[in-house]
Amino acid sequence: MAVASSTVPSKEQIFAPESLLKKKKTQEQSREQRVAAAAEKKAAQQKKRELIAKRAESYDAEYRKAEREQIELGRKARAEGNYYVPDETKLVFVIRIRGINNIPPKARKIMQLLRLIQINNGVFVKFNKATKEMLQVVEPYVTYGIPNLKTVRELLYKRGFGKVNKQRIALSDNAIIEAALGKYSILSIEDLIHEIYTVGPNFKQAANFIWPFQLSSPLGGWRDRKFKHFIEGGDAGKRDEHINSLVRKML
């Protein structure tokens, strides 16, 4: 007589369905969390894009207002028979025009401090008493002047690189700028342009983040007497607003 097989379910058979249900529930919860996180991230990104766009509009209005004020001050001065002299600039753009030969140690040290390591390197510098004295020492080896908004913007858009973990990274995405400067409320390239151009409270951090610009030799070449001072027909030293036309030739 054959022994009837047991109909009592084993321990594995009893708990297998429950474990499968738990696994399925966990997977479902995980999927829901991922969907919710993705939706939250998308909403945050949209909000950030709107903030960046709003800031850009605000900056544009600010730049236009400042330009109108300068024009009006000039007109008023002329109407009164005077000559309008703008406030001394807070920002200069400095370009190294000479190589490493025959540069005295003090001037060489200042060039290193300014991060002008190679010929045709360019940097934004806050113009104050200390940097003014430094630039006077290195005048024979650099040229510098007052960059306008167009120059600042074109430099950053066309030749802008950031320093990320000591690496030279192209500023191709606002996320790169935000990761480095977000704690200073600099989230986009337009924020960066504004901070540099207006010499804002976080100028030092912004300028140090920007890798020294590597420019090309100017279209048409340097002047024949390149190392003479600009006012003597050369290229060295202070050139005020004429730095803008030079930068255009070097982009």
Curated annotation (Swiss-Prot):
What job does the chain carry out? Component of the ribosome, a large ribonucleoprotein complex responsible for the synthesis of proteins in the cell. The small ribosomal subunit (SSU) binds messenger RNAs (mRNAs) and translates the encoded message by selecting cognate aminoacyl-transfer RNA (tRNA) molecules. The large subunit (LSU) contains the ribosomal catalytic site termed the peptidyl transferase center (PTC), which catalyzes the formation of peptide bonds, thereby polymerizing the amino acids delivered by tRNAs into a polypeptide chain.
Q: Where in the cell is it found?
A: Cytoplasm; Nucleus; Nucleus, Nucleolus
Question: Does Membrane show up as a keyword for this record?
Answer: no
Gene Ontology BP terms: endonucleolytic cleavage in ITS1 to separate SSU-rRNA from 5.8S rRNA and LSU-rRNA from tricistronic rRNA transcript (SSU-rRNA, 5.8S rRNA, LSU-rRNA); maturation of LSU-rRNA from tricistronic rRNA transcript (SSU-rRNA, 5.8S rRNA, LSU-rRNA); tRNA processing
Any further remarks? There are 3 genes for uL30 in S.pombe.
One GO MF term: structural constituent of ribosome
Q: Which family does it belong to?
A: Belongs to the universal ribosomal protein uL30 family.
What's the subunit arrangement here? Component of the small ribosomal subunit (SSU). Mature yeast ribosomes consist of a small (40S) and a large (60S) subunit. The 40S small subunit contains 1 molecule of ribosomal RNA (18S rRNA) and at least 33 different proteins. The large 60S subunit contains 3 rRNA molecules (25S, 5.8S and 5S rRNA) and at least 46 different proteins.
Task: Give the species this sequence originates from.
Answer: Schizosaccharomyces pombe (strain 972 / ATCC 24843)
Q: Which residues carry this modification: Phosphoserine?
A: 58, 245
Report residue spans for region: Disordered: 19-40
The protein, known as: Large ribosomal subunit protein uL30C
Q: Which SUPFAM superfamilies match?
A: Ribosomal protein L30p/L7e
Give the range the annotation lists for the signal sequence.
none
Q: Which domain of life is it from?
A: Eukaryota
The record's annotation in Pfam families points to: Ribosomal_L30, Ribosomal_L30_N
